[in-house]
Every structure is written in C-alpha cells, then in structure tokens.
Curated annotation (Swiss-Prot):
It comes from the Eukaryota. Residues 291-300, 320-331 have a biased composition (Polar residues). This is Zinc finger CCHC domain-containing protein 18. The keyword Zinc-finger applies. Keywords: Metal-binding, Zinc, Zinc-finger. A zinc finger (CCHC-type) spans 346-363. Pfam families: PNMA. Residues 281-300, 313-341 are annotated as: Disordered. One of its GO terms (molecular function) is zinc ion binding. The lineage of its organism: Eukaryota, Metazoa, Chordata, Craniata, Vertebrata. Belongs to the ZCCHC12 family. The keyword Transcription regulation does not apply.
Length: 393
C-alpha cells in the first residue's frame, strides 16, 4: 500500500510539470491545423463561372452558394481573407465581374459579396410575377393577421427588388393590401382606414411601417384573446343537472315556516334569478274540508304536494294599521280576486308519479317520465301569464 501511494504521488508531480507543456503543444497544433482545415473546406467548394454551359468541375450558382454556406463556419479568419478564398473559387465571367465590384468597394464584407452574387447570377422573378404574387397573397383560413402580415412582407420585398413597387411606397402599399386581404376587427380596420385617408389628404402624415403595424395587430389580438378568456356564460347548468337537483340555492338559505297543517319552505331569490318567489308546501296531515277551503284551493288534491309560485307584484300593498301602528297585508275578500297563484304539482323525481316524494317511493325508476315532467314544468315556468293592466279608480 505504501509503495502504491508513493507511485501515485510521483505520477501527480510529473503530470503537474507536464501540463504547461501539453497546453503549449495543443495551441501550436491548433495554429498549424487551422489553415489546413480551411484549405480542406475550400477544396470542398466547386468552381463557378457564370456561363450558361457548365465546364468540367463547375457547379450551378445554387449549388455553389449552398457549398459556401456550409464551409463558412469552418473559416476562422478575417473578412478580407474569406473574400480572397471565395474569389479563388470563381472562374470566367463571374470572377471578372466580382473583381470589378471589389475594386469599387474596397471595404467589402462576405455578406455584401454574396448579395452581389445573388443579384448578378441568382434566379430572379419577372416583375409581373412578383407583382401578381403580392396582390394574390390573402389571409388563409384560421391564420392570425400578424402571421399574414409577415407572409405578405416577403412578397412585398420581392416586388420591390423586381422593380415593380418603389421603396418609398412600401408602407402605403402594405397597409392597403392588409385591408384588402385580411379579416380585421372593426376597431382596427377603422383606425387603419383613417390613417390611409389622412395620408391621402396630407402626405406628411407618416404611415406605420412593418414593425409598427405588427405591434398594432398583436395588441389587438392579445386584447381579443383576453376578452374571450374572461368571458363566461351566465348560466352553465344543463337541463339534466336541473333534473338531478330540482332546487339549487344560490343566494341565502331557505326560510322554513312551520304550521299545524304543513311545512312551508320559502326560497329567497338572488338577483340573478327571476322576480318570483318559490314556495314549497308539504302537507303533514290532511286538512279538514270546509267550504271556504274548498273554494280557495279549487280542484287541487289535499293529499299531494304543491308548488305555488307567487309574483311579488301580485301581493297587495301593505297598509298601515291605525290601532297598532304596524303595517300588515290586506286579506279581505277583494284582495283575493287580485291575487294570482300558479300551482304546480310536485312529482316524484324517481318514478315521475304525483302524490309522493322520492323517499317514500316504492315504484321502479322511470327516467323518461321524469324528463317529460321536467320539460313540461320548465315550459310552464317560462311562459308565465302576463299581468293584466290595472283598472284606474
């Protein structure tokens, strides 16, 4: 073990002394291999002459340009040296043309060199084709206006390079084609039309350029998305959910009032509900029959549960009492004629039959009858009878 540790210590001391020498060797190797790698990359570029008929070892302009873009990242040298290497790949008319262009532009860089090559030898569209493509560029179905403007800008620049449209009219032409080919909101369309009209009357009024137009459209799109995301339906409860839960309390809790004959549950409506009070009457014992009670209750059965809906407008106005000083509701015979009560029998939500509740139901489930009863009740609740006009005294 001691001998092994001694050997490890000796190797570390030797490596520490060797590290500076290794770094210097790698740097020298990189400096020597850099030009070699560049020469190898240059040899991968075929020559280009610009002639219609290709000679031996020559490439078309598109292939030559593709090879140049592949080897440029492997050239760690100055712009001037890169242009010299590119010139060595040219032959014939192409070399002569770029030599004259370089003489007129001594500070030429690689990007300008390649741009000049594209203008001289690249395939260019005719002016009629470029103009037709620009005018026929319309917004696709489901495409956002901001993406359409970006696609339109490409065709606009092609038309400008073809000489169809002047650069000074780019903003006006872009804005006009946007109004023709895009589906915009009413507010944004009105705003852009106003800018065009102001520019037509006064050319000193500046029109938005490409970036400003993109910003305006993106702001409108963000506002529309926020509005649609925050918009919620007023009532999202479905009919089947209402069937499963006939009464949903959204406001205050119901008030239970006990009496000798029945339990009366009065439901306070919230502001979103209708202007009618819903009262559920559950009889405990059959009330004693009397002529007055029979005339008031009509043909309704005394053994069944009833749903009574009274509109607050139907209640009589409270009149102050002269004896006690507290207001109470008039219950005279004349007031009964003005009170309108709509009675709807409550049916069992399990079998759909009348006269009993779900807790005491012994019948089999009949969802079809329950759903039919629900539709009828909803139709009756929706089409309330209109109040008759009051007769002037």
């Amino acid at each position: 073990m001691a001998s092994l540790l001694a050997r490890m210590g000796n190797s570390r001391r030797q490596n520490a002394a060797f590290m500076p020498f290794a770094h210097s060797m790698l740097r020298a190797l990189g400096r020597s291999l850099g030009p070699l790698i560049a020469n190898i990359a240059e040899r991968n570029i075929q020559s280009f002459s610009g002639r219609a008929e290709l000679g031996p070892g020559e490439e078309t302009f598109e292939n030559w340009l593709s090879q140049v873009h592949e080897v440029l990242p492997d050239w760690p040298m100055s712009e001037e040296e890169k242009i010299k290497r590119l010139m060595r790949t040219l032959r014939g008319p192409a070399r002569e043309a770029m030599r004259l262009f370089q003489a007129d532009n001594p500070n030429l860089n690689v990007a300008e060199f390649l741009r000049a090559m594209k203008l001289l030898f690249g395939a260019s569209e005719s002016s009629i084709t470029a103009h037709g493509k620009f005018l026929s560029t319309l917004q696709a179905q489901g495409e956002k206006p901001s993406l359409y403007v970006i696609r339109l800008e490409v065709q606009l620049q092609n038309a400008i390079q073809a000489g169809v449209l002047p650069q000074s009219e780019a903003n006006r032409t872009r804005l006009h084609q946007l109004l023709v080919g895009a589906e915009l909101s009413r507010e944004l369309r009105t705003k852009l039309k106003g800018l065009l009209q102001m520019h037509a009357h006064n050319e000193q009024e500046n029109l938005p350029d490409f970036l400003e137009l993109i910003r305006m459209i993106r702001e409108e799109e963000d506002w529309d998305e926020t509005f649609l995301r925050n918009k919620r339906p007023r009532r999202s409860e479905t009919v089947m959910e209402r069937a499963a839960s006939p009464v949903v309390f959204q406001g205050s809790l119901p008030i239970v009032i006990g009496s000798a004959d029945c339990n009366v549950i009065e439901i306070d409506d919230s502001q979103d509900d209708s202007d009618e009070d819903v009262i559920l009457v559950e009889p405990e014992d059959p009330p004693l029959s009397s002529p007055g009670a029979s005339s008031l209750r009509g043909t309704a059965s005394t053994q069944e549960e009833m749903l009574i809906i009274e509109s607050p407008d139907d209640f009589d106005e409270e009149s102050p009492s002269t004896s006690s000083g507290s207001g109470q509701r008039n219950n005279g015979p004349g007031d009964l004629g003005r009170t309108r009560k709509r009675k709807y029998p409550i049916r069992c939500p399990h079998c759909g039959e009348e006269g009993h509740a779900k807790e005491t139901c012994d019948n089999t489930s009949n969802k079809g009858q329950v759903f039919e009863n629900l539709i009828v009740t909803l139709q009756e609740l929706t089409h309330m009878e209109r109040p008759k006009p009051s007769v002037p005294y």
